[in-house]
């Protein structure tokens, strides 16, 4: 089989055509993590503004704050896994 490769070459990424996409994927994880953290901060500000402006929309504000916690946790996890 001419197209078969040894799995250790893929894991260690010694070949340039395998190593470069893995580096690009690693970089994109941290970029996605930063974007998720920024979106989560935006959701926190929207939730705080909704809570301070009107008392009738507490459900919407709490949904924004819960979404921000989920997105922030995911973004922090991606950045933490990228740097470890």
Curated annotation (Swiss-Prot):
Compartments it resides in: Virion membrane
Organism in which the protein naturally occurs: African swine fever virus (strain Badajoz 1971 Vero-adapted) (Ba71V)
Signal sequence region: none
Family per similarity comment: Belongs to the asfivirus EP84R family.
Name recorded for this polypeptide: Transmembrane protein EP84R
Presence of the UniProt keyword Transmembrane in the record: yes
TM helices/strands, residue ranges: 31-51, 60-80
Keyword Cytoplasm attached: no
Gene Ontology CC, one term: membrane
Keywords associated with the record: Late protein, Membrane, Transmembrane, Transmembrane helix, Virion
Principal subcellular localization: virion
Induction or repression: Expressed in the late phase of the viral replicative cycle.
């Amino acid at each position: 089989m001419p197209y078969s490769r040894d799995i250790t070459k893929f894991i260690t990424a010694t070949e340039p055509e395998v190593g470069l996409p893995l580096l690009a994927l690693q970089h994109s994880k941290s970029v996605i993590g930063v974007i998720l953290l920024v979106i989560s901060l935006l959701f926190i500000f929207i939730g705080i503004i909704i809570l301070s402006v009107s008392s009738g929309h507490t459900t919407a504000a709490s949904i924004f704050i819960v979404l921000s916690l989920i997105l922030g946790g995911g973004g922090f996890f991606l950045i933490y896994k990228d740097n470890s």
